[in-house]
Amino acid sequence: MRSNCEEIVIRMKNLFRFKVTKDTGIAVIAGLVMIALSLLMIPFGGDSLRDTVISFILRDVLMIFGLGVVFVSLYVEKKSKEVIAELGFSRRKWALSLILNLAFAAGLLAVFLKDGKPADVISLKNLYGASYILVAGIFEMTFIYGFLRMSFEKAFGIIPSILLTSVFYSLHHAGFQPEFLHLFLVGLMYCGVFYITKNMLIIFPFFWGVGALWDVLVSSEAGDEIKNPVSFGIALVILFASVIWVLFRKWRRSSNVVKNIDSNLGNAQER
């Protein structure tokens, strides 16, 4: 049996460590690319067709779909299926995570509603915005709270991981919601809560959803830009493209397995 001192040492190593690897560098570069894409959006914040198209390419295509879906899925394929659990997507304590998710969401909503419900909070335009926010949330779960957090934890430990992830989370809003201190604190909250069960179901979709929807649609002027049918359409396109990409990669892996089996059988027959 381990002594109390050994247990303390192990826990401290989980909280703080220094084990920088090639994967750490990949995470930092990917995170900086995310921030750069957001910063590039600043000159294109107008309502013109050109600004809309460029913002769509920068945020929706390259950031949300490119980094959140394509990059993360290819990274997982290159490593192993076990990485999926390390990202926070597993059956580990899923029931407890879901219960806590609902409880935290209810508590947060109660705090928001203590001064009364805002007028027109339930409306078609807010539905458009909510659809876009929830789809964009998939990117935050896979890339920021998943990939970046996991990479920083492996390199520096849990505490630095929470801090670094929150910094990147805050800075990735630079081009469309520059409320850095507020969003840093939001990142601390969600990232810290994640470590209660290490399952993404403890924050997404309800707890994160309540905070994100209220923060963007009610408290921030940034929400006005997505309260329209175009944003709803973009959300559907991203969601559809993500499903197609996942199915395509799954088919590709299955096809490669069959080819390898056929190749091995052919080599065996030649012998």
Question: For each predicted feature, which ranges?
Answer:
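Function-critical hydrophobic alpha-helical transmembrane segments in multi-pass membrane proteins
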Residues: 66-70, 119-175, 185
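Hydrophobic alpha-helical transmembrane segments
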Residues: 24-29, 97-99, 127-130, 159-164, ...
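Aromatic-anchored segments of alpha-helical transmembrane domains
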Residues: 32-40, 105-114, 166-175, 208-219
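Functionally important transmembrane alpha-helices
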Residues: 40, 180-236
